[in-house]
From Swiss-Prot:
Residues 6-244 form the ABC transporter domain. The keyword Transmembrane helix applies. Part of the tripartite efflux system MacAB-TolC. MacB is a non-canonical ABC transporter that contains transmembrane domains (TMD), which form a pore in the inner membrane, and an ATP-binding domain (NBD), which is responsible for energy generation. Confers resistance against macrolides. It comes from Aeromonas hydrophila subsp. hydrophila (strain ATCC 7966 / DSM 30187 / BCRC 13018 / CCUG 14551 / JCM 1027 / KCTC 2358 / NCIMB 9240 / NCTC 8049). This is Macrolide export ATP-binding/permease protein MacB 1.
């Protein structure tokens, strides 16, 4: 007596509700023993394919009990049913249902992939089966390169890769010529003799007669169940089960999903590119905006540093725009000398300025004459190009010595002509040139201005005839906080003046304000750029939904051969993330190209890239792939396998 393997009791299956309810199976009671070869026959609409789908756990009965090897299936989850299909069943379809992008070898190996079999073992087993079925020379052929009979043999090999304890064949010869059909039936007969349980659905009684048991359906009910002379029992085949919990199985599935993602992208190159385009533009915009903001911040901070690091500027009046500031004449050289005596002060320079005509020979230009102390160039960090700077002795002696900048040098002297020792007129005051400094790069005034510097005593006495200063520049020691130094300096000047008739400009405050403003603007523009990235993500979701719709049959095939819900979810999620990652990489490259073009065509804009920004771009593109790819992937994973298989 053979052991019962498949047991159906009171199986009913209906579709629709109410007036539209259609009864397809009506109380099927059936037991199929291990090692039997059963043919299910009947006219179209008799319910034989629906019964086969229930036997293969592709569909669930509306009522009744179905047990596989004693295990009740009605309460099993989708993943548990997938495991049951993978470990017990092998499917042979009338239309083969091979994946067109995969080779014969990879199609056969697909169920073993979901069973967790390692890559080399999976490949070797698939090759052995194909060689056994006469396809050893066509391992790498795609389905489109094979004949119908060869495709059906690939389908048979796929059914056997995990052991094929039960082979379910739905009209296996229906799409074949007579010779190929006879070959397929011969293979199925051989499998039966080897101990496999075969359930064959056909409408051809001549084919059914080759089975040892024939079950006839009519209008959803069994009307006949007759047996022929049984084939001598053979040992049941051993189902080869891999360790599905091993890391190798997960790695194999991830690798295969990655490969399938590349194949899907390559099959639709233009669509993939257009999908990526939104991500490319979004990532390029975000990275470029962040780089521009970072570059602008660095440039502004460099300009502030060019004014002098750790410096305080003291001006008369209550602030910029104070109309009474011109009348305030209390800022004196003595104040500068008092400030120089403070322990936390590094250097001090008085300052006053006026605009006059600079003349040398026939050359006459308008320039700015600055009366400063000997420490001015140290406070402001000017770089000496030629000659020397005036010293304390020159200040004391009211020396008529002048230091000029590069712009003045270019306008007053010929190319290659040395200015040192030459006399120029500052208005009507003759002064001897003793040095040349680099042009102003502070960014708080044009670097095209013409500037010359003379001792402040000379400017006050010989040129302007005044005793008050326009400003005092103070550089504090590096280890001293500017805010604390500002408080001390303000307190000293209030004591000297008896009133708050001055204001202090703290370069550190400017730096902080500009940094904060720049960060805010960068964030604002980056948020605008992120909108384009979100639009790109919506495009990815749209295309992935289209892809799921187009590949519904592929999803059904994967589920039929044992793919779990998580496997399908993983497959489509990897595709979405891969599209976004490649788009992110292209976006970063585009941003770098934009930076090169900016540097080449414009010196006013500097893009400063950072590794953090690039890594953040890849993180954002991956996140977009996960967020916008999850819904299409979940939709694919929740498909009903039989409905997916039946959809063209």
């Amino acid at each position: 007596m053979r052991e019962p393997l498949l047991q159906l009791s009171g199986i009913r299956r209906h579709f629709g509700d109410g007036e539209r309810r259609v009864e397809v199976l009506k109380g099927i009671d059936l037991t199929i023993a291990r090692g039997e070869m059963v043919a299910i026959v009947g006219a179209s609409g008799s319910g034989k394919s629906t019964l086969l789908n229930i036997l293969g756990c592709l569909d669930q009965p509306s009522e009744g009990s179905y047990r596989v090897a004693g295990r009740e299936t009605s309460r099993l989850t989708a993943d548990a049913l997938a495991t049951l299909r993978r470990e017990h069943f092998g499917f042979i379809f009338q239309r083969y249902h091979l994946l067109g992008d995969l080779s014969a070898r990879d199609n056969v190996a697909l169920p073993a992939l979901y069973a967790g079999l390692a890559g080399d073992a999976r490949k070797a087993r698939a090759e052995r089966l194909l060689q056994r079925l006469g396809l050893g020379s066509r391992l790498d052929y795609k389905p489109s390169q094979l004949s119908g009979g060869q495709q059906q043999r690939v389908s048979i090999a796929r059914a056997l890769i995990n052991g094929g304890q039960v082979i379910l064949a739905d009209e296996p010869t229906g799409a074949l010529d007579s010779q190929s059909g006879a070959e397929v039936l011969g293979i199925l007969g051989a499998l039966h003799r080897q101990g496999h349980t075969l359930v064959l659905v056909t409408h051809d009684m001549a084919i059914a007669e080759q089975a040892e048991r024939i079950i006839e359906l009519k209008d959803g009910a069994v009307v006949a169940d007759r047996r022929r002379e049984p084939t001598p029992p053979s040992p049941a085949p051993t189902t080869s089960r891999a360790d599905t919990g091993g890391r190798g199985g997960l790695a194999g599935r991830l690798g295969a999903a990655f490969k399938m993602a590349l194949l899907a992208m390559r099959a639709q190159r233009m669509r993939t590119f257009l999908t990526m385009l939104g991500i490319i533009i979004g990532i390029a915009a975000v990275v470029s905006v962040v780089a521009l903001g970072r570059g602008s911040q660095q440039q502004v901070l460099a300009n502030i540093n060019a004014m002098g690091t750790s410096t305080l500027e003291i001006f008369p009046g209550s602030g910029f725009g104070d109309r009474r500031a011109e009348a305030v004449q209390t800022l004196r050289v003595e104040d500068a000398e008092a400030l120089a005596g403070l322990g936390y002060v590094h250097s001090v320079t008085p300052s006053l300025a006026t605009s006059v005509t600079l003349r040398r020979g026939s050359q006459a230009v308008l320039g700015s004459v600055n009366g400063v102390g000997e420490q001015f160039f140290q406070v402001r960090g000017y770089r000496l190009l030629q000659g020397m700077l005036f010293d304390a002795a020159s200040v004391t002696a009211l020396a008529q010595e002048v230091v000029i900048d590069e712009n003045s040098l270019a306008r007053l002297f010929g190319a290659g002509e040395s200015p040192l020792g030459q006399v120029i007129l500052l208005g009507s005051l003759p002064c001897r040139v003793i040095g040349v400094v680099a042009r102003n790069q502070s960014g708080f005034g044009s670097d095209e201005n013409l500037n010359v510097w003379i001792p402040h005593t000379t400017a006050m006495t010989r040129m302007l005839g005044q005793s008050h200063l326009r400003s005092i520049s103070v550089r504090v020691q590096d280890e001293v906080a500017l805010a604390a130094a500002e408080d001390g300096i303000s307190r000293l000047l209030r004591e000297r003046h008896g009133a708050q008739d001055f204001f202090v400009l703290n370069t550190d405050s400017i730096r902080q304000a500009i940094t904060s403003t720049n960060a805010t603007l960068t964030l604002l523009i980056a948020m605008i750029a992120l909108i384009s990235l979100v639009v790109g993500g919506i495009g990815v979701m749209n295309i992935m939904l289209v892809s799921v719709s187009e590949r519904t049959r592929e999803i059904g095939v994967r589920m039929a051969v044992g793919a779990r819900t998580g496997d399908i979810l993983q497959q489509f999620l990897i595709e979405a993330v891969l599209v976004c990652l490649l788009g992110g990489a292209a976006g970063v490259l585009l941003s770098l190209l934009i930076g090169v073009l900016f540097e080449h065509f414009s010196s006013q804009f500097t893009l400063s890239y950072s590794l953090d920004a690039v890594l953040m771009a890849f993180f954002c593109s991956s996140l977009i792939g996960v967020l916008f790819g999850f819904f299409p992937a979940r939709r694919a994973a929740r498909m009903d396998p039989i409905h997916a298989l039946e959809r063209e």
